[in-house]
Curated annotation (Swiss-Prot):
This is Large ribosomal subunit protein bL32. The gene is rpmF. Signal peptide: none annotated. It comes from Deinococcus radiodurans (strain ATCC 13939 / DSM 20539 / JCM 16871 / CCUG 27074 / LMG 4051 / NBRC 15346 / NCIMB 9279 / VKM B-1422 / R1). Residues 1-23 have a biased composition (Basic residues). Forms a cluster with L17 and L22, and with L22, a pair of 'tweezers' that hold together all the domains of the 23S rRNA. Interacts with the antibiotic troleandomycin which blocks the peptide exit tunnel. PANTHER family: 50S RIBOSOMAL PROTEIN L32, LARGE RIBOSOMAL SUBUNIT PROTEIN BL32.
């Protein structure tokens, strides 16, 4: 039967939490659409009105 590698020492809470310190989620950067004043992502087409950079790109 094959032997599997196992941890020699228990990982402390401090080491475990330090490893996970970069796992946090970031909130999306929402801006106001200048056409319909709805919320939209920066550098993306507005999902409410379909405008981008002052012109209609998507028929909504």
């Amino acid at each position: 039967m094959a032997k599997h590698p196992v941890p020699k020492k228990k990982t402390s809470k401090s080491k475990r939490d330090m490893r996970r310190s970069h796992h946090a989620l970031t909130a999306p950067n929402l801006t106001e659409c200048p056409q319909c004043h709805g919320k939209k992502l920066s550098h993306h087409i507005c999902p409410n009105c379909g405008y981008y950079d002052g012109r209609q790109v998507l028929a909504v």
